[in-house]
């Protein structure tokens, strides 16, 4: 079955689209990635999405216009990726504007903005969306949702494999080996903390909006990281939590950046960006070390994907801090770094069609497995 996956993440830079084909048993599908495409958000739309994700108040009319603009961007990405309309089913994550994990016995909630009936009408094909709702209803975090799909797509290794997505937020998937004592272990996963979110906001601030990200790590390469503050930041509550845990721009947004820049004092732009970049790598390294110390799991591979994979300074910091794991990009496994999450949501849509569960309760904290997503047929 041909499926189209659409993903727009916390970096809010645009929509990644993937056309893929899935066949065979749901738990171990045969798959091929046929096309992928990135559709950039217009700068004003990107600005509005970032502001909404940080709790900026907006009148209802602007919320409606934002939902329409996001949906149209998804449609444009889908049409560009699949001009011949081969896909029989669309899996669309939507744009997260707020994520609230469960806390103090209060139910979690997460809002992925999308007008799914409009998207189904524009594409004249069924759309599966609202993937997080079922897991949240079962008491889970609703995130991360990629681990089960990661294991199905990129499993079968001789040792533990770690998959690291470097979007706005850094999240890890740990896939158990196909042989040995751990072969029956459950897949693991969680959100580590900021990857590009603070770096991108810092670049906008230091360049007065001229640059929205640190292209090629150029700014970070000119600076020196403040290791003392990095170690202090690693002691903060979120980074000491054990999984399941999830987070987003509501925690690591402009207010958080302002606090950290104030703590860095008179640091130059280059030193501040270098520190934020090293910090993003350090939160991942600390989580992997906590995993090793707590349950004895040490991945032999660390496979990166997402926009941060294109930042050589961030990759060098990961390589330096995550010793013992061979670092490589997901492209080495046949999945372009910018296509991984869109491929996951294409698979989740196919699983929804097949009635196959998509969450991992040990990862999200949900009370049981669930088929994820809500299907909307074209009008």
From Swiss-Prot:
NCBIfam families: PRK09585.2-5. This is Anhydro-N-acetylmuramic acid kinase. The keyword Chloroplast does not apply. Its EC number is 2.7.1.170. It holds the Pfam family AnmK. It catalyses: 1,6-anhydro-N-acetyl-beta-muramate + ATP + H2O = N-acetyl-D-muramate 6-phosphate + ADP + H(+). The keyword Kinase applies. GO terms for molecular function: ATP binding; kinase activity; phosphotransferase activity, alcohol group as acceptor. Pathway: Amino-sugar metabolism; 1,6-anhydro-N-acetylmuramate degradation; Cell wall biogenesis; peptidoglycan recycling. Belongs to the anhydro-N-acetylmuramic acid kinase family. GO terms for biological process: 1,6-anhydro-N-acetyl-beta-muramic acid catabolic process; amino sugar metabolic process; peptidoglycan turnover. ATP binds at residues 9-16. Keywords: ATP-binding, Carbohydrate metabolism, Kinase, Nucleotide-binding, Transferase. Catalyzes the specific phosphorylation of 1,6-anhydro-N-acetylmuramic acid (anhMurNAc) with the simultaneous cleavage of the 1,6-anhydro ring, generating MurNAc-6-P. Is required for the utilization of anhMurNAc either imported from the medium or derived from its own cell wall murein, and thus plays a role in cell wall recycling.
């Amino acid at each position: 079955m041909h499926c189209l996956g659409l993903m727009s993440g916390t970096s809010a830079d645009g929509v990644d689209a993937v056309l893929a084909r899935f066949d065979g048993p749901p738990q171990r599908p045969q798959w091929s990635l046929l096309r992928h495409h990135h559709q950039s958000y217009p700068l004003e739309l990107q600005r509005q999405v970032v502001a909404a994700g940080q709790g900026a108040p907006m009148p209802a009319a602007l919320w409606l216009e934002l939902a329409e603009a996001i949906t149209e961007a998804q449609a444009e990405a889908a049409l560009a990726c699949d001009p011949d309309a081969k896909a029989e089913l669309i899996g669309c994550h939507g744009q997260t504007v707020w994520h609230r994990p469960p806390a103090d016995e209060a139910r979690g909630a997460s809002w992925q903005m999308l007008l799914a009936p409009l998207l189904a009408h524009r594409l004249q094909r069924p759309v599966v969306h609202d993937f997080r709702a079922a897991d949240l209803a079962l008491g889970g975090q609703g995130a991360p949702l990629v681990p089960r799909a990661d294991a199905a797509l990129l499993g079968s290794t001789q040792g533990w494999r770690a998959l690291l997505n470097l979007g706005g937020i850094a999240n890890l998937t740990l896939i158990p080996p196909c042989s040995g004592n751990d072969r029956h272990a459950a897949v693991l996963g969680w959100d580590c903390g900021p990857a590009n979110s603070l770096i991108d906001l810092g670049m906008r601030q230091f360049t007065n909006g001229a640059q929205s990200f640190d292209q090629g790590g150029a700014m970070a390469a000119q600076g020196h990281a403040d290791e003392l503050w990095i170690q202090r930041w690693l002691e903060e509550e979120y980074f000491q939590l054990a999984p399941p845990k999830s987070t987003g721009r509501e925690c690591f947004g402009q207010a958080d950046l302002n606090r950290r820049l104030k703590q860095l004092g008179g640091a130059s732009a280059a030193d501040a960006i270098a520190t934020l970049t090293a910090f993003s790598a350090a939160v991942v390294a600390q989580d992997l070390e906590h995993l090793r110390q707590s349950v004895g799991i040490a991945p032999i591979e660390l496979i990166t994907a997402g926009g941060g994979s294109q930042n050589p300074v961030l990759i060098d910091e990961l390589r330096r801090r995550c010793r013992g794991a061979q670092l490589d990009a997901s492209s080495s496994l046949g999945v372009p770094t910018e296509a991984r999450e869109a491929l996951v949501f294409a698979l989740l849509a196919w699983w929804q069609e097949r009635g196959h569960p998509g969450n991992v309760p040990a990862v999200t904290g949900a009370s049981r497995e669930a088929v994820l997503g809500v299907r909307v047929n074209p009008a």
